[in-house]
Amino acid sequence: MIKNLKINDGKATALISLSPSDMQPYDIPIFIDDESGDIQRESQIYPILDRVKSFFKRINIVGLIRDISIEINQACYEQSDYEPTELDNKELANDLKIVNITAYFDDLLFIYYSGSFLPDMEISAQITYEGELENLEIYDK
């Protein structure tokens, strides 16, 4: 699941292999941040890595992306009379790509990109290890 863990200049990076249903497995960069700014040994980040592994064993990544797409559509259409449909949510979910993940001890920060629907924007979703969305931001690249 987590591979190619490297520690350089006090920072830890790796790849996490995800395989959502109906899709080919793919690797996503993951940054591990213990908030010390000075990671020297793998053992410093074991607690975070354990939480990440547990999260991805429990969470349905397709369901998570679907939930994020609903939140994005609600945020995008909040100022209008248009109510996003299930098809809108499904199309956005199919287009969303996880660019990278940053893992902290308390939560995860997912960065998403939607080339068809929000090509000039970046989407960040702060997710707890229980799978709850804490914060969603959509901003210019």
Task: Label the model's feature ranges.
Residues M1-L18, N94, N100-K141:
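Acidic, proline/glycine-rich low-complexity IDRs
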